[in-house]
Amino acid sequence: MKIRCLKSDLVKGVSIVSKAVPTKTTMPILECILIDATTDIIKLTANDMELGIETVIRGQIDEKGMIALDARIFSDIVRKLPDNEIVIESGVNLQTLITCEKAKFNISGKSGEDFSYLPYIERENPVSISQFTLKEVIRQTIFSIADNDSNKLMTGELFDMNGDILKVVSLDGHRISIRKIELKESYEPKKIVVPGK
């Protein structure tokens, strides 16, 4: 695999997916970020088996392939590189060379085939809501989610949709936050708990 991209694009992508890298795990592959350049796009993926994040970054693919790199090491290297084009190249022995101007880093990777992929989600009956409104609703309710894992449902927010009303609810056992908004369209009743992480 050999790809080229700007530092700014790579840093942005790495910071997005890093939120799904677990701090403690018994599976070392989950401590990695998957760089997937097997198609015509460059995808970065992280997955802790509860939360998975995938993002696409701009760049050029010189040679297709995929590699999983330790998230902490990769993130530290990328952030310290000069603001220029970064070349990431991995060989058959999974050694990965990261170059930018005169800086060169050689790190060991893991096979991308061993990475746990995100499940494919069928997009049926999507809901339209403005980004601003969604951010505001989350900001106004996220503070009251539970921060311990004693009850998994309380570590997320309930999105309860009924007709043209969306109700977002979070609670931690001591306090509760409820926010109702009116949607532009009417939808079938649905309830889903979205992890607060």
Where are these regions (language model features)?
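Structural preference for solvent-exposed beta-strand-turn elements
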Residues: M1-K197
